[in-house]
UniProtKB/Swiss-Prot annotation:
Cofactor(s) required, per the database record: FAD
Keyword Membrane in record: no
Organism this protein belongs to: Arabidopsis thaliana (Mouse-ear cress)
EC top class named in words: oxidoreductase
Name of the protein in question: Flavin-containing monooxygenase FMO GS-OX1
Matches recorded under SUPFAM superfamilies: FAD/NAD(P)-binding domain
Example GO BP: glucosinolate biosynthetic process from homomethionine
Reactions catalysed according to its record: a (Z)-omega-(methylsulfanyl)-N-sulfo-alkylhydroximate S-glucoside + NADPH + O2 + H(+) = a (Z)-omega-(methylsulfinyl)-alkyl-glucosinolate + NADP(+) + H2O
One Pfam short name: FMO-like
An annotated Gene Ontology molecular function: 4-methylthiopropyl glucosinolate S-oxygenase activity
């Protein structure tokens, strides 16, 4: 959509969340001339990257009265993307080699990601826009604007009116738990990966881990360091799958899905194998959940599809005053947050115009029909995967910003291939030094780093 020639408007905008999405959204909104208030329940920026050894009071996170811990980070977590392709486009996530307290590895720990986000917030003076320890309890449309009710840690309640609201609250708090026939009578323990922190509690146990992607692959191998046996139940595997993996302790097996959980403590897999397990760990993802949002029925979550959303961002009936940043998965997350937020900021200012409500709905209906034809279930609507860069470049063209760099796209593709083929070593052994070199040369050309690329590549 071509930029408009109308006078640029400045809006009063509420941003919900001060994680990676909220931070870059606040920056882009302010760059576009908007006034911004960011709400976050934590004491510092970083969102889910704020590690806590604490977990929900309910290990499965099903009890609605549970004490909730708003992070899903486990102690051993390292990024599953190379740092140079993970960072924001104009603030590279490069090693702070001169600082011995920092993690200079190419696939660093969660603590290094938090430090990077704190660096970003300081560099762009974002913290001055954030109300820390403040929870948004209700957001609803009122006379063309938005009512935002919040309360802080000492119980002070506030009610304010904003021109627009951008939801950057993430989707890693409300766990999705696998349906297992017979599980109600199964006597063992269950926990969702949201509440997993360290392997110690599983010492000498037989553990079944449901899920073998990202956190499932990591957590199963982490637990295997101390457990007697670890058995992975993978929905992606064929029904007869049964494979013993030699790493890390020769006590790890991959199976097909669970068929039944029995009262005697046994777990029957669809491959016919039976295991007597102490604990089941659900690495089964999360549900989209916006308990504070009241839109009078305009928005619905249907089988984990947030609908109807135009390009995963705008709700046609309330666009552009309500938008979402960061809903899609299987994408270059921080870059996606940045490009989506540039679009939202430009649309709110009037510099870029959205299609009409009818046109946006037509696009959404056509997209849903395409997913149906391809046999993609509703729950995967927001998983981009192979189309992620096409999606991001489409938005970039809309708001006249740079597309995703080729080296970044290739790094993600090759990194994913390594992760699938060598999950134990892909973070420490790689074959794309050429792309890493291209990335640092790109940073140098754009004057985003002060040192010569060789300083980072040879360290």
């Amino acid at each position: 959509m071509a930029p408009t020639q109308n006078t640029i408007c400045s809006k009063h905008v509420a941003v919900i969340g001060a994680g990676a999405a909220g931070l870059v959204t606040a920056r882009e909104l302010r760059r576009e001339g908007h006034t911004v208030v960011v709400f976050d329940r934590e004491k510092q920026v970083g969102g889910l990257w704020n590690y806590s050894s604490k977990a929900d009071s309910d290990p499965l996170s099903l009890d609605t009265t549970r004490t909730i811990v708003h992070t899903s980070i486990y102690e051993s977590l390292r990024t599953n993307l190379p740092r140079e392709c993970m960072g924001f486009t104009d603030f590279p996530f490069v090693p702070r080699i001169h600082d011995i307290s920092r993690d200079s590895r190419r696939y660093p720990s969660h603590r290094e990601v938090l430090a990077y986000l704190q660096d970003f917030a300081r560099e762009f003076k974002i913290e001055e826009m954030v109300r820390f320890e403040t929870e948004v309890v209700c957001v609803e449309p009122v006379n063309g604007k938005w009512s935002v009710r919040s309360k802080n840690s000492v119980g002070f309640a506030a009610h304010e009116i904003f021109d627009a609201v951008v939801v950057c609250s993430g989707h890693f708090t409300e766990p999705n738990v696998a349906h297992i026939p017979g599980i109600k009578s199964w006597p063992g323990k269950q926990i969702h990966s949201h509440n997993y922190r360290v392997p110690g509690p599983f010492n000498n146990e037989v553990v079944v881990v449901i899920g073998n992607y990202a956190s499932g692959a990591d957590i199963s191998r982490d637990i295997a360091k101390v457990a007697k046996e670890v058995h992975i139940a993978s929905r992606a595997s064929e029904s007869d799958t049964y494979q013993k993996l030699p790493v890390p302790q020769n006590n790890l097996w991959v199976h097909s899905e669970i068929d039944f959980a029995h009262q005697d403590g046994s777990i029957l897999f669809k491959n016919g194998k039976v295991v007597y397990a102490d604990t089941i760990v659900h690495c089964t993802g999360y549900k989209y959940y916006f308990p504070f949002l009241e839109t009078n029925g305009y928005i619905n979550i249907n089988e984990n599809r947030v609908e109807p959303l135009y390009k995963h961002v705008f709700l046609p009936a309330l666009a552009p005053s309500l938008s979402f940043i960061g809903l899609p998965g299987m994408a270059i997350q921080f870059v996606m947050f940045e490009i989506q937020s540039k679009w939202v900021a430009a649309v709110l200012s009037g510099r870029v115009i959205l299609p009409s409500q009818d046109k946006m709905m037509e696009d959404i209906i056509e997209w849903y029909a395409t997913l149906d034809v391809l046999g993609i279930p509703k729950r995967h609507t927001h998983k981009l995967g192979k189309i992620s860069c096409e999606y991001l470049n489409w938005i970039a063209e809309e708001c006249h910003c740079s597309p995703v760099e080729n080296w970044r796209i290739q790094e993600v593709e090759r990194g994913f291939q390594r992760m699938v083929s060598h999950p134990e070593i892909y973070r420490d052994e790689w074959d794309d030094d050429d792309l890493m070199e291209e990335a640092y040369k790109d940073f140098a050309r754009k004057k985003l780093i002060s040192s010569h690329p060789s300083y980072f590549l040879e360290s």
